[in-house]
Amino acid sequence: MEGQRWLPLEANPEVTNQFLKQLGLHPNWQFVDVYGMDPELLSMVPRPVCAVLLLFPITEKYEVFRTEEEEKIKSQGQDVTSSVYFMKQTISNACGTIGLIHAIANNKDKMHFESGSTLKKFLEESASMSPEERARYLENYDAIRVTHETSAHEGQTEAPNIDEKVDLHFIALVHVDGHLYELDGRKPFPINHGETSDETLLEDAIEVCKKFMERDPDELRFNAIALSAA
């Protein structure tokens, strides 16, 4: 992924909500913290939920799993509805923005956009593109890049040097046509995690998040935020 490099976004609802507002999304849906993965803490998350973003560490164990998963799907196949909006990641550290795009694009019918919304324009213009074409389109989309950079400086922790290697990565978990999809621009395709519904999306997405944590039990750097109706 050599080439463009952006500053990483924090998994911080204040940052992501402000970022989306600047891109012209009406705040009828807002990101909120998921404070824990047990039922009691999940019950504190406002419903309905239409997407979950997971921030996790890219470790050696994870990379081994990712390679095995990719090979298995390539040999066995999987069902992926054509309704899924998926894009590749070609910009280093842009995974936060790509996660947000995946979350909004796959729930576009639920969202309200302000007049002249940059994000709405990007989604409309890229609607018929391939995942690779969408990635290249984002590379040249200055309005989103500039907003991303502004948001990256607004986190609670100081933004790292732009050349610093970052081993944390965002993915989006969304419900499309009755199935739960993991959308990760580092992967060649969406991952179908089985059936879900609007009512059970949060719990089903958290089960996927738990698998990430179980693969790396010594790691603590996991953070989930949910896109909830405000």
UniProtKB/Swiss-Prot annotation:
Activity regulation as described: Inhibited by monoubiquitin and diubiquitin.
Gene Ontology terms, MF aspect: cysteine-type deubiquitinase activity
Keyword annotations from UniProtKB, A to Z: Cytoplasm, Hydrolase, Phosphoprotein, Protease, Thiol protease, Ubl conjugation pathway
Important for enzyme activity (site feature) positions: D184
Entry's EC annotation: 3.4.19.12
Site, as annotated: Transition state stabilizer: Q89
Reaction equations catalysed: Thiol-dependent hydrolysis of ester, thioester, amide, peptide and isopeptide bonds formed by the C-terminal Gly of ubiquitin (a 76-residue protein attached to proteins as an intracellular targeting signal)
Region (Interaction with ubiquitin): 8-13, 219-224
Compartments, record wording: Cytoplasm
Active site, UniProt feature: C95, H169
Modified residues (Phosphoserine): S130
Keyword Electron transport among record annotations: no
Class of this enzyme: hydrolase
Renumbered residue ranges of the record's region Interaction with ubiquitin. Crossover loop which restricts access of large ubiquitin adducts to the active site: 152-159
Domain UCH catalytic per the UniProt entry, residue ranges: 5-229
GO BP field: protein catabolic process; ubiquitin-dependent protein catabolic process
Annotated function: Deubiquitinating enzyme (DUB) that controls levels of cellular ubiquitin through processing of ubiquitin precursors and ubiquitinated proteins. Thiol protease that recognizes and hydrolyzes a peptide bond at the C-terminal glycine of either ubiquitin or NEDD8. Has a 10-fold preference for Arg and Lys at position P3''. Deubiquitinates ENAC in apical compartments, thereby regulating apical membrane recycling. Indirectly increases the phosphorylation of IGFIR, AKT and FOXO1 and promotes insulin-signaling and insulin-induced adipogenesis.
Complex formation: Preferentially binds diubiquitin; the interaction does not hydrolyze diubiquitin but, in vitro, inhibits the hydrolyzing activity on other substrates.
Family recorded in the similarity comment: Belongs to the peptidase C12 family.
Matches recorded under PANTHER family: UBIQUITIN CARBOXYL-TERMINAL HYDROLASE (PTHR10589), UBIQUITIN CARBOXYL-TERMINAL HYDROLASE ISOZYME L3 (PTHR10589:SF24)
Protein name: Ubiquitin carboxyl-terminal hydrolase isozyme L3
Source taxonomy: Eukaryota, Metazoa, Chordata, Craniata, Vertebrata
